[in-house]
Amino acid sequence: MKYSLFTVSVPEMTLEEAAKKMQEYGYDGVDWRVTDIPTDPEILKEAPSYWKNNYCTVDINKVEEQAEEIKALSDKYGLEINALATYLDCSMDPEKIESCMRAAKKMGCSRIRVNALKYDVARNYTEIFAEAVAGFKKVEELAKKTGIKADFEMHMGTITASASAARKLASYFDPKYIGVIYDTGNVIYEGFEEYKMALEILGPYLDLVHIKNAQWVKKEVDGKEKYV
């Protein structure tokens, strides 16, 4: 088993600071966070945060041109690039998805994250599911073309919150090209199935496991006790 750190978790560190710390703690690899870098001056004034002003982020618009630089940085600290963790989903611009795959190939990285679609109460699940299948058919073709696998994450609020739902979608595709990220924290919020059973359900589609802390906490909300 190998351990990798997803850099969303260290928003206060630069790429090099994080890589150095990972080496110190004995990590095998790194999942680089890849998305748009904020340009809003107000956001840039904010303290580092997971989702907004995250210093440990690779700009998705420059990821191809910076691929060799990022690989050199990872190599410097003895880190395998385990994944490029994008926030793209299967319905988004295929060129942007392919660009990230090309960047991954240059880095010697075998996979990128491309997520499934969010559930929308204003739409029918069957319609969203069909759209996701159509989207991942295009993603699978890009994976075959580039040799880079695309994984989608089990995530609350999406149509793949549980292992069963994730397997249903993944089963339309070759596990060589489309895989699933089992997220132990996300299933606490939504989609929990007994751990061993969940892994058995995912079978050959299970590609990565995210480990993080999550729990329900009782709080008083509007004068009532609720779990949040």
Task: Identify the meaning behind each predicted range.
Residues 19, 138-228:
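Acidic/histidine-rich catalytic cores of soluble enzymes
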Residues 122-135:
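Active-site cleft segment of glycoside hydrolase catalytic domains centered on the general acid/base Glu
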Residues 7, 86-88, 116, 152-156, ...:
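Short glycine-centered, acidic/aromatic-flanked micro-motifs in structured strand/loop junctions
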Residues 44-48, 97-99, 127-130, 166-168, ...:
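Short low-complexity, flexible loop/linker segments enriched in glycine and/or proline
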Residues 38-42, 120-125, 188-190, 219:
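A short acidic, helix-capping loop that chelates divalent metal ions and anchors anionic groups
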Residues 104, 109-125, 146-159:
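Active-site groove signature of glycoside hydrolases
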Residues 1-114, 137, 144, 175, ...:
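N-terminal pre-domain/capping segments
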Residues 10-11, 89-92, 120, 157-158, ...:
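Glycine-/small-residue-rich active-site loops that bind phosphorylated ligands and cofactors
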